[in-house]
Amino acid sequence: MDDLKELEYLSLVSKVASEIRNHTGIDDNTLAEFIINLHDQSKNYDEFKNNVLSCGGEFTDSFLQNISRLIKEIKPKDDIPTDNVNNGSNSVNGASHDLDSKDVDKQHQRKMFPGLSIPNSTNNLRDRPALMDNAMDELEELSTLAKTRRNDRDSRRDERHYLNGIRERRERSISPSFSHHSRTSISGQSHSSRSSRGPLLNAPTLYGIYSGVVSGIKDFGAFVTLDGFRKRTDGLVHISNIQLNGRLDHPSEAVSYGQPVFVKVIRIDESAKRISLSMKEVNQVTGEDLNPDQVSRSTKKGSGANAIPLSAQNSEIGHVNPLETFTSNGRKRLTSPEIWELQQLAASGAISATDIPELNDGFNTNNAAEINPEDDEDVEIELREEEPGFLAGQTKVSLKLSPIKVVKAPDGSLSRAAMQGQILANDRREIRQKEAKLKSEQEMEKQDLSLSWQDTMSNPQDRKFAQDVRDSAARQLTSETPSWRQATRNANISYGKRTTLSMKEQREGLPVFKLRKQFLEAVSKNQILVLLGETGSGKTTQITQYLAEEGYTSDSKMIGCTQPRRVAAMSVAKRVAEEVGCRVGEEVGYTIRFEDKTSRMTQIKYMTDGMLQRECLVDPLLSKYSVIILDEAHERTVATDVLFGLLKGTVLKRPDLKLIVTSATLDAERFSSYFYKCPIFTIPGRSYPVEIMYTKQPEADYLDAALMTVMQIHLSEGPGDILVFLTGQEEIDTSCEILYERSKMLGDSIPELVILPVYSALPSEIQSRIFEPAPPGGRKVVIATNIAETSLTIDGIYYVVDPGFVKQSCFDPKLGMDSLIVTPISQAQARQRSGRAGRTGPGKCYRLYTESAYRNEMLPSPIPEIQRQNLSHTILMLKAMGINDLLNFDFMDPPPAQTMIAALQNLYALSALDDEGLLTPLGRKMADFPMEPQLSKVLITSVELGCSEEMLSIIAMLSVPNIWSRPREKQQEADRQRAQFANPESDHLTLLNVYTTWKMNRCSDNWCYEHYIQARGMRRAEDVRKQLIRLMDRYRHPVVSCGRKRELILRALCSGYFTNVAKRDSHEGCYKTIVENAPVYMHPSGVLFGKAAEWVIYHELIQTSKEYMHTVSTVNPKWLVEVAPTFFKFANANQVSKTKKNLKVLPLYNRFEKPDEWRISKQRKGGR
C-alpha cells in the first residue's frame, strides 16, 4: 500500500470510528478496522450485515448502511470489489450526465472549499426514538442490548473472541448501565490502591496531585472521583483543562467513563463545596506535576497580619466551574485604599477583622483574584486565530469573494431615489418632533408657574417645575390620536367580505372548480406537477380537498400542504375545516412552530415549510404522506429552497409520492426545468388588460410622487379603487396622514376618499376593512406593503401606483449582521403589481420610474432568501440529516460560499461541529430544538447552570418579533410605561420582568393595553414557552430557577452569543464588535442607551440609518473566556494587545474649535 492509499485508509478508519462513537459511545479505532475487514470479506450488504450480527454487533440497519456507504466512498478504489455492498440508496440525480460548465465550476469550488464538500452520511437522527416518541426509549433499548450481550457472551464461538475482547475493554467507557462488572473491577482497583498508600485523607489541598476515576461526562467537562479520602470527594475538570494541546469539542474525545486519571486541584470553593481540577498540568503516565512553580508561589506568604501571598497572580484565570453559582447580594467590592484603611484599623485593635465580611472575603484566601471574578482591573481578551481543521485556509479565501448583488445598478436612478427617500424620511421625522416641541413650549407660555410658588397659602401639589409641565404637555399632545386614524377606527368593526352564497356555491364559483377533472387526471399521470394559478383562484384551499375526495388519503396517508408563513397555515386550515365541516385538528389540521393541531384522524395537514423540513429530519422518505404540495413556491423562502432539494431526491426513492409545486407568478418554467422538466398545469385567472404608464424623468421623492398620483387619480379618473405599494409602516402612516389632510382641505368639492392602511402590525379587524366595498359615490385607497402582491386579492382595484421599491433583509457574512434596506423591486414583482389592477376589469398601473430603469436597473426576478440570509440554522439541519456535501446539494440557486463558510464557522464556535466538520453530540442536541443554534446552545447551557426556568421565558419572548406597542401619536407615554419594567443592565432581563409581571396579572389583555404591550404577542410567547417545556420534558432536561442569581442568566446568554460581543470605544462614541472591530451603536429603545456599559452582548444587529444593536445586556469579559475558551483568550500581559494597537492618542484641543484645528497642516499661513 503506497503512502496515498495509506492516508486514505487512515481517513476511512477515522470516519468509521467517529460514526461508531456517535452511535454507541465506543471510541476505538481497532473496532473500526475490524468492521472494515468484515466489509471487505462480504460480497453484498446482506452478507456484511449477517457477518456483523454473527460477531455480536447488534447495530441498527440504517447504521450499517451508513458504514457500508462510507467504506465504499472513502476506501481506495482499487481495494473495493466490483460487486461489493449495495446499501439500497438510489442516486438523487438519477443517471449520470456529461461534464458541463456547471460541473467544472463545482469541481473548482470543491478544490477551493473542501470544507463544503464533506461526504454525506446517513441520517442517524431518524433512528433515535427521542425525536418521534420519547427520549428514554433509546436508553431502554441500549439497556436491553447490554443485557443481551452479557447473556450471550459465554456462548459465542471462538472466532468471535476478537470482538468480545474489544467490547470487554470498551464497555467501561460507555455508561454505568452497560456493565456492572466493569464498575466493580474499577472500584476494586481503587480500594487496593488506597490500602497500599496508607491512611485515608480528610480533604484535598490546593495544587495537590491525586489519582481518581472519571465518574461522569458532561458537555462542559468531566467529573472525577478522587481516591484516598474518607468521604467521597468529586471535582470537575473543565473541558479546557483536560488536554494540553488541541481543541476538544466534547470531553468524551479524551476521557471515558471509569478511566483512571491523575488530576491537580487548582481551586477549592469552600462555600459551594466545589473543587476545580486540571488534567493538563499533570503527566497522565507518571503523575508528575508539569507546573510546580505554581505550588511554590502559593507557599510564599507575606509577613503582614492578613498573610497575603506576595505573588497572587491567577495563572488559571478563566477556568471556572460552569456550575458555580454567583452571589447577587449587591455588596460593593472595596477599593485598594479602603482595604488598606480597614487593615490598619484592624491591626491597631480599633475594629475586629471578623466583623468586616468584605475584608475576609478578599484576603482570607490564597488567591483573592480567583475568588472575586468581578475584578476592577481592565481585562483584555483577544480572538484565537486558529481556524477549524476542516476549514483551514478557506475562511480568508471566502472573504475575497464578491457577495450576491441585491441591487443591479448601485449608481442608477432607483438606487439614488431609495437613498434620498431615507434622508427625506429622517427630515420628516425631525420636523414632527420640532412641531411637537414648539407646541408644548407654546402651552408653557400660557401658564404662570411662579404664582403658585410665591403664594405661601397655595396647595403644594399645585407647585410644579417647568420641565414637568413641559413633559406633561408633550405627552398630552402626542397622546392624541390623529384624525385619519380616528376616521378609520370610527367605522364599524369588520371581519372580512360578507357573502350570501352557500359554502357549496362559493366553492363552485372559484376558477379551479371548472378544471377539477383535468387537474386530477394530470396528478394521476405525473409524479411531479407544477401548478400555475393566480391569487384567489382557489388552488390553496380546493386542490387538497379534491385529492382527498379522490382517495389519496387511504391507507392512513395524509396530504401535506406547506405555507411560507404560519398565519397563512392557520387561516387556510380553519377555512378548509369549515368547508369540510369539521373542527380544526380532526380531518383538517395544521402544524406550525411550537403548535401542533393534528390528530390520528387528520387527512389534510397544512404546515409551514420549516416544519416539513424538520419532518424530513426524522423521516426523509415522508412515509406518512401520499401527496406533498409546496404552496406559494414563488416566495422562495430558505426552507422552501431546502425542501426543493430534499423532495427532488425523495420522489426518486418513493415512486408512490406525488409532488405538486404551486406558484402565483409566471416563473413556472424554471420550476418545471428544475423538477426533471415536469408538466405545467395552468389555472386561468380573472385577468383583464392593464395599461402601464411610466414617468418621463426619475422621481427624486417617490413618496410625494405617489401621493400626488393618488390625488390625481381621485380627481380625474373614473370610478375604481386605488392600490399603493410602499415599503413599511412609517411610510404608510405618513402617507395616510398627508392624504387625509389634503382631502380634508378640498372639503365636499371632491368625492369621499376612504384611506385604509395594511401592514402586519395592524389588528386583523382593521386589515379586514380593505375587503369591504367603497361607499356609494366614494373611492377607497389601500396603502400596503408588498404583502398585497400575491398574498391578498382585493376586489374593485382598478388603479395601481407602484413607486418601485421594497424593504428587505440582507445578511452580511463579514459583519454577521442583518441589514434592513430599501431596494428596487425586480421585473417579476413589477409585473405582479401591475396585474393587481386587472382582476376586476380593465385597469391602469402608474409606475413611478422610467421605462429605462425598468429594463436596465431591475433584476429579472427577486433574490431568493437563501442567498441573502444567515444559514447557520439551515446548515445545522442539513448536517443533522447527514447532508455534509453542501456544494453538491441540489439547490435551485446555490447560496454564496462565504455565507456557508461563515455559518460553518459559527457552528464550530458553538461546538456543534468537530474538527472534521461533522456534528458533535452537542450539535445533535441543538438540532432537536426548533430555533436558532445560538438559542439552542443558550437553553442547553441554562440547564447546566440552573436557570432554565428564566431562560425559557426569555427565549419565548425573543421568539415574538416585537411585544412593545408604540403608536406614533403616543410614543412618549408608551416609553414611560416601558420604563417601569426596565432592568438597568439588560434588555433580556427586561423581557423577563415583562413576562413575570404579565403572569402575575393573570395574563390580562387590559393590563397589556394599559402598559402598551401587544397582548397577542404575549399570548404567542406563552404558547412558545409551553411547547418548549414539553420538549424539555421529552428530553429529560430539568426546568429549575436560579432565583435572584441573575448573573447566571447573563452567563448562559454568553454561551450562545459570545460572537455578538462589543466593547465601548470612548474616543469614537460607539461600540466596536470584538470579532470584526466594526462600529455599532446602541439602539435608542434599549435600556442601555445613553449609559456607559463597557462590555455588552447583543441579540442581533440591524442596519437602518446606522448599525444598531438590538436586545443588549452587559457582561463580564471574563465570562467570555470561560464559556468559549476555544474562541477567546486573555491577552498577553507582557505584550501590546491588538485592541491597544488600534487605539489612537488624541490630544486635547479647544472644544469651541473644529477637530484637528491644532494640527500644523490646518494652520493658515499669514502673509508677509
Curated annotation (Swiss-Prot):
SUPFAM superfamilies: Nucleic acid-binding proteins (SSF50249), P-loop containing nucleoside triphosphate hydrolases (SSF52540)
Subcellular location: Nucleus
PROSITE patterns: DEAH_ATP_HELICASE, HELICASE_ATP_BIND_1, HELICASE_CTER, S1
Residues of the S1 motif domain: 207-280
GO biological process, one term: mRNA splicing, via spliceosome
Gene Ontology cellular component annotations, sorted alphabetically: catalytic step 2 spliceosome; nucleus; post-mRNA release spliceosomal complex; spliceosomal complex; U2-type spliceosomal complex
Binding-site residues, ATP: G533, E534, T535, G536, S537, G538, K539, T540
Ranges where the record places region Disordered: 77-100, 144-197, 287-314
Motif (DEAH box): 631-634
Reaction catalysed by this enzyme: ATP + H2O = ADP + phosphate + H(+)
Biased composition (Basic and acidic residues): 149-173
Class of this enzyme: hydrolase
Record's compositionally biased regions (Low complexity): 84-94, 184-197
All residue ranges annotated as the Helicase ATP-binding domain in the record: 520-684
Domain of life according to the entry: Eukaryota
UniProt keywords, alphabetically: ATP-binding, Helicase, Hydrolase, mRNA processing, mRNA splicing, Nucleotide-binding, Nucleus
Subunit (UniProt): Belongs to the 40S cdc5-associated complex (or cwf complex), a spliceosome sub-complex reminiscent of a late-stage spliceosome composed of the U2, U5 and U6 snRNAs and at least brr2, cdc5, cwf2/prp3, cwf3/syf1, cwf4/syf3, cwf5/ecm2, spp42/cwf6, cwf7/spf27, cwf8, cwf9, cwf10, cwf11, cwf12, prp45/cwf13, cwf14, cwf15, cwf16, cwf17, cwf18, cwf19, cwf20, cwf21, cwf22, cwf23, cwf24, cwf25, cwf26, cyp7/cwf27, cwf28, cwf29/ist3, lea1, msl1, prp5/cwf1, prp10, prp12/sap130, prp17, prp22, sap61, sap62, sap114, sap145, slu7, smb1, smd1, smd3, smf1, smg1 and syf2.
Family to which the UniProt record says this protein belongs: Belongs to the DEAD box helicase family. DEAH subfamily. DDX8/PRP22 sub-subfamily.
Function: Acts late in the splicing of pre-mRNA. Required for the splicing of introns with a branch nucleotide to 3'-splice site distance greater or equal to 15. Mediates the release of the spliced mRNA from spliceosomes.
Protein name stated in the entry: Pre-mRNA-splicing factor ATP-dependent RNA helicase prp22
Organism: Schizosaccharomyces pombe (strain 972 / ATCC 24843)
